[in-house]
């Protein structure tokens, strides 16, 4: 059967189509070059179908995620009459988040979703099977994502019009503070449900009578992560593996705490709203009792421009030499990644031991705040050599302690690093192995191929435009290597 999943809203619109075998995916920010792009009317998604040469009349069912629909308590979907020639459903925002886990593994029975807000202003939902069984109202209890974004506004961080990037920036900023143990104990009286009270800065100012204090941010951020990890480590059904999604699941610091508990958890790389259309087609698959979809090629499913060739051994060797010599290397291969992290197809790479890399990349290449940290890609078999971690982290969504003090460019001020474990034999893994052969190191700095305020490059000309500006020394697009 032919299914279409649509995320239609004012930000992070995306489309997924499947014929039961292949999956097509488009995040419209990559299509239009506007970060967090959202459709302002319900028909713009036809542009994507036209690009894919798909007609609405050929579809068997459509599922839509939009935050404008109110669902009854416990209701996870509703059939709509929108005049389409096929059955059409609205799916609850948080339920779709949970179902979107399917490309990384079987969707667990129990799922926890935390984000800014979804349908009915819910900031948290507990999913059990097909039922949204427990929810928290953002207006009453607050929202982790929203409260963190509000902090970003308070301290004057640059933001997109809706403040969607602020929570991530605040996550990086929090590490610069110190934990106030007395205040940590004070807010512990609120438990974990009342996020508004936990993130109430006025209670801190009443204590210290000062302007914004980074120690307050570090303390409440640490407390929130600790409580979240404790909560998820005791799942309602006692499940061995749970699902965890929503925008808050992009918080690598929190994810590191969760994984440290030993609780089995599946966190997709598209945990934010860019994955909702994937959840929509999974809803339709279940509704119509179809076979599970193939996840072949995941997470490199972006409908963007891919080079015609892959890099050969000689090109990979030249790229590794560039990294060995301390150069900044842009790497554009295949189709782009789903989600906000670059995982080796749309990357800017550099030595993890360059002391000036963070300053140089933030100031001259990415054009973003000086305090922003960088992640690392490491060969999976060597992970424990560099980091206090021995598991998988293929999607760079977990922060772990750094063991090697020499990894200055990827070590955040709190001694942690967001890591991507790499295995297999694709071109990125081959590059890492060649670099290891030359230097003895199998870890490099890996950040996304974009500048602040723009989406990750999705067209070859966009990558070349970045290369033409200050900062990047070498670029590899497919099998073509460009030097300055």
Q: Where do the PLM segments sit?
A:
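Phosphate/pyrophosphate-binding loops at sites that engage ATP/ADP/AMP, CoA/4′-phosphopantetheine
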Residues: 44-60, 232-240
């Amino acid at each position: 059967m032919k299914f279409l999943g649509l995320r239609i809203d004012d930000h992070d619109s995306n489309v997924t189509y499947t014929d039961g075998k292949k999956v097509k995916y488009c995040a419209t920010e990559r299509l239009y070059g506007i970060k967090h792009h959202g459709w302002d009317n319900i028909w713009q998604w036809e542009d994507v179908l036209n690009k894919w040469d798909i007609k609405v009349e050929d579809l068997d069912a459509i599922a839509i995620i939009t935050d404008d629909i109110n669902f009854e308590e416990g209701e996870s979907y509703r059939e709509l009459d929108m005049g389409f020639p096929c059955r059409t459903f609205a799916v609850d925002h948080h339920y779709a988040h949970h179902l979107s886990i399917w490309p990384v593994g079987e969707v667990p029975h129990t799922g926890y979703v935390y984000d800014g807000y979804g349908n009915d202003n819910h900031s948290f939902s507990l999913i059990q099977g097909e039922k949204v069984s427990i929810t928290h109202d953002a207006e009453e209890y607050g929202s982790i994502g929203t409260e963190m974004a509000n902090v970003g506004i308070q301290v004057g961080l640059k933001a997109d019009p809706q403040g969607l990037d602020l929570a991530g920036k605040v996550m990086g900023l929090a590490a610069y503070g110190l934990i106030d143990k007395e205040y940590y104990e004070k807010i512990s009286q609120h438990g974990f449900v009342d996020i508004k009270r936990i993130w109430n800065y006025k209670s801190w100012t009443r204590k210290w009578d000062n302007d914004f204090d980074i120690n307050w941010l570090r303390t409440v951020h640490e407390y929130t992560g600790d409580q979240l990890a404790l909560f998820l480590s005791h799942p309602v059904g006692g499940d061995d593996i749970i699902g965890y999604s929503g925008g808050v699941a992009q918080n690598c610091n929190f994810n590191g705490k969760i994984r440290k508990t030993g609780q089995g958890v599946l966190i997709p790389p598209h945990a934010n709203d860019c994955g909702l259309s994937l959840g929509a087609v999974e809803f339709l698959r279940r509704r119509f009792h179809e076979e599970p979809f193939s996840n072949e090629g995941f997470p490199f499913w972006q409908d963007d421009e891919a080079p015609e060739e892959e890099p050969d051994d000689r090109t990979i060797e030249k790229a590794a030499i560039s990294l060995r010599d301390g150069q900044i290397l842009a790497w554009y291969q295949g189709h782009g990644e789903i989600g906000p992290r670059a995982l080796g197809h749309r990357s800017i790479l550099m030595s993890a031991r360059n002391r000036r890399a963070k300053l140089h990349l933030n100031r001259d290449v990415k054009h973003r705040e000086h305090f922003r940290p960088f992640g690392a890609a490491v060969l999976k078999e060597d992970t424990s050599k560099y980091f206090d971690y021995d598991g998988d982290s293929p999607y760079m969504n977990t922060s772990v302690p750094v063991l090697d003090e020499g990894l200055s460019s990827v070590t955040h001020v709190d001694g942690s690093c967001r890591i991507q474990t790499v295995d297999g034999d694709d071109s990125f893994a081959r590059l890492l192995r060649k670099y290891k052969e030359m230097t003895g190191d199998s870890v490099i700095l890996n950040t996304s191929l974009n500048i602040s305020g723009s989406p990750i490059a999705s067209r070859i000309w966009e990558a070349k435009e970045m290369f033409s500006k200050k900062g990047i020394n070498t670029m590899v697009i497919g099998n073509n290597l460009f030097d300055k």
